[in-house]
Amino acid sequence: MRVGVIGAMEQEVKLLREQIENCEIVSRGGCEIYTGKINGVDVALLKSGIGKVAAAIGTTLLLEHFRPDVVINTGSAGGLDAKLNVGDIVVSTEVRYHDADVTAFGYEPGQMAQCPPAFIADPKLVNIAQECIGSLKLNAVRGLICSGDAFINGAEPLARIRRTFPEVVAVEMESTAIGHVCHQFDTPFVVVRAISDVADKESHLSFDEFLSVAAQQSSLMVTTMLDKLKTETQF
């Protein structure tokens, strides 16, 4: 079992990289990929860069060159569910673009042309994440995560996303692109992120203050999931 783990920013991958045994670094296309073992599990950890294009480039490189069996997207997210606070966990059941609009041609809001309306997270990975949440006694919500090339900071964009996707639990800038590429490569994926801010008019201040908290919580989730994946033989 080889697990691909993807984070956008240095703060989101640093704690995991420090745990990799016999770490080797590959730099390609503006991305860095760190390979080795965490707790005996083969890992390829990608630092992709921020945004959908960077995430898609990095995920493609990861899948083409390192062939992980599954992919976990880690890092931070802005919470939209009322039950979420800073440090809580969100787990994707599906991911959608909040800034894609080809509805003029009969597609659903957020659906890219010639693609499914949503990219569905692997149910087995979702269940493993839920088991880890239970064992760690963390507060968590699972559901739809939406991505777009904008940091959501203000009432108008927040209202638009909630109006268009009333079931959304969190927003960020990479996971749907990652899910899109995994769909194209037929690779199981799940998004497991920690809340760094509650998406509102002050979210940029909260993000700066609490990113390290989110990084700690999301990294803890990944290492706990790796322990469970150690005994899995296939997906």
Curated annotation (Swiss-Prot):
Enzyme class (EC, first level): hydrolase
Enzyme Commission number: 3.2.2.9
Swiss-Prot/TrEMBL catalytic activity: S-adenosyl-L-homocysteine + H2O = S-(5-deoxy-D-ribos-5-yl)-L-homocysteine + adenine; S-methyl-5'-thioadenosine + H2O = 5-(methylsulfanyl)-D-ribose + adenine; 5'-deoxyadenosine + H2O = 5-deoxy-D-ribose + adenine
InterPro entries named in the record: MTA_SAH_Nsdase, Nucleoside_phosphorylase_d, Nucleoside_phosphorylase_sf
GO biological-process terms attached to the record: L-methionine salvage from methylthioadenosine; L-methionine salvage from S-adenosylmethionine; purine deoxyribonucleoside catabolic process
Listed GO CC annotations: cytosol
Cross-referenced SUPFAM superfamilies: Purine and uridine phosphorylases
Top-level taxonomic group: Bacteria
Sample GO molecular function, one term: methylthioadenosine nucleosidase activity
Keywords for this protein: Amino-acid biosynthesis, Hydrolase, Methionine biosynthesis
Residues that hold substrate according to the record: G78, I152, M173, E174
Pathway: Amino-acid biosynthesis; L-methionine biosynthesis via salvage pathway; S-methyl-5-thio-alpha-D-ribose 1-phosphate from S-methyl-5'-thioadenosine (hydrolase route): step 1/2
Active site: E12, D197
Function: Catalyzes the irreversible cleavage of the glycosidic bond in both 5'-methylthioadenosine (MTA) and S-adenosylhomocysteine (SAH/AdoHcy) to adenine and the corresponding thioribose, 5'-methylthioribose and S-ribosylhomocysteine, respectively. Also cleaves 5'-deoxyadenosine, a toxic by-product of radical S-adenosylmethionine (SAM) enzymes, into 5-deoxyribose and adenine. Thus, is required for in vivo function of the radical SAM enzymes biotin synthase and lipoic acid synthase, that are inhibited by 5'-deoxyadenosine accumulation.
HAMAP family: Salvage_MtnN
Family per record: Belongs to the PNP/UDP phosphorylase family. MtnN subfamily.
Quaternary assembly: Homodimer.
Protein name, per record: 5'-methylthioadenosine/S-adenosylhomocysteine nucleosidase
Provenance organism: Proteus mirabilis (strain HI4320)
